[in-house]
């Protein structure tokens, strides 16, 4: 199973419904990701990074394969 995503859980505590909508997901599903019960898809990971202004990153959400999915980040 995935690991707990504390930055995501902290963000979810203060996120508005509009901010949640920007992720293309629901608060309930994001909580499942936050508690490590679900893995964030590449699309949700990228949307979360944008919606949180970088508080939650794709690298945090997908530590095992982010460099394969987003090779441009590996060079940065």
Which residues does each predicted region cover?
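A short, Lys/Arg-rich alpha-helix, primarily the initiator
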Residues: 1-22, 50, 56-68, 72, ...
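Helix-turn-helix DNA-binding elements, focusing on the entry/boundary residues of the two helices
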Residues: 16-17, 42-45
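Recognition helix of helix-turn-helix/homeodomain-like DNA-binding domains
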Residues: 25-40
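DNA major-groove recognition helix of helix-turn-helix
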Residues: 34, 44, 52
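Short, solvent-exposed alpha-helical "recognition" segments
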Residues: 37-43, 69-70
């Amino acid at each position: 199973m995935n690991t707990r995503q504390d930055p995501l859980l902290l963000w979810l505590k203060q996120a508005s419904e509009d901010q949640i909508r920007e992720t293309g997901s629901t608060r309930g599903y994001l909580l499942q990701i936050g508690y490590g019960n679900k893995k964030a898809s590449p699309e949700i990971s990228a949307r979360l990074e944008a919606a949180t202004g970088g508080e939650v990153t794709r690298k945090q959400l997908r530590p095992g394969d982010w460099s394969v999915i987003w090779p441009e980040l590996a060079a940065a």
